[in-house]
Amino acid sequence: MNHSIVIGVLAALSGSLAWTLSSSLWRSIKTSLTAWQLNGLKIVIATLFLCPVLLFLPWSEQTNGLMLLMASGAIGIALGDSFYFAALRRQGTRRTLTIEALGPLLASFYGMTFLAEIINLKSWLGAILVATSVVIAAFQQPPENGVGFNRQFSSQRLGLLFALSGVICGVSGAALSRQVLLLGQITPLQSAAIRLLGGLVLIIPWLSKCAY
C-alpha cells in the first residue's frame, strides 16, 4: 500500500477518534454557554495555540490561497462546528455522529462532480450503508434515561436540521481547503491555523447575539 495512503487513513481515523472523544466530553460538561459561544471559546483557545504558525505564513506570496482557507474556516469551523454543537445538545452524541457520517458521502459526490474522481463499487456500497444508518438514526428517539435531552418532536427536528447543516458546512469548508492543499504550497498545519483564524473572524462579532 502506498505510504501516503497509509498516512491519510491513520490521520482520518485519528481525527474521527478525536471528534468522538471531544463530543462525549462536551456532552458531559454542564454549561450555560450556547453552542455558538462554546465554539467561539474553542476557536479562541485553538487559535492562540497555533498563533506562532500564523506569524510565519506566506501572506504576500499565497494571498489567494490563504483567503480561500479563511473562507473555508468561516464556513466549516465557525458555522459547521456551531451547528454540530447545537445538534449534540438536542440529539446526543450517537445520533449526531451517525448523521455526521454523511460527510464522506457528500465529499465523494463533490470529488466525482468537480474533481473528476472515480468512485468504485465498494465505495458506493459503503455510501449506501451510511445513508441507511443515517435514515435509521434520524427516526430514532433518544434513550429515556438520556440526561439533558429534549424529547419533544420540534427539538429533535431542529437537532436533525442542525446536524445536516453542520455536515454541509463541514464538507463545503473541507472542499475549499482541499483545493489549496492540492497545490502543495501550504502545509496541513498552516492550513489548520489559517482556517481557525477565518473562523475566529466570523464568530467573534456574533458571540453575544446568537442564542442557539
Give residue ranges: language-model regions:
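Membrane-interface helix termini and inter-helical loops of multi-pass transporters
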Residues: 1-3, 55-68, 116-121, 146-149, ...
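Structural signature of hydrophobic alpha-helical transmembrane segments
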Residues: 4-18, 63-77, 121-132, 187-201
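Hydrophobic/small/kink-forming positions within alpha-helical transmembrane segments
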Residues: 17-20, 51, 74-78, 104-109, ...
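Structural motif at transmembrane-helix junctions in multi-pass transporters
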Residues: 31-37, 82-102, 184-190
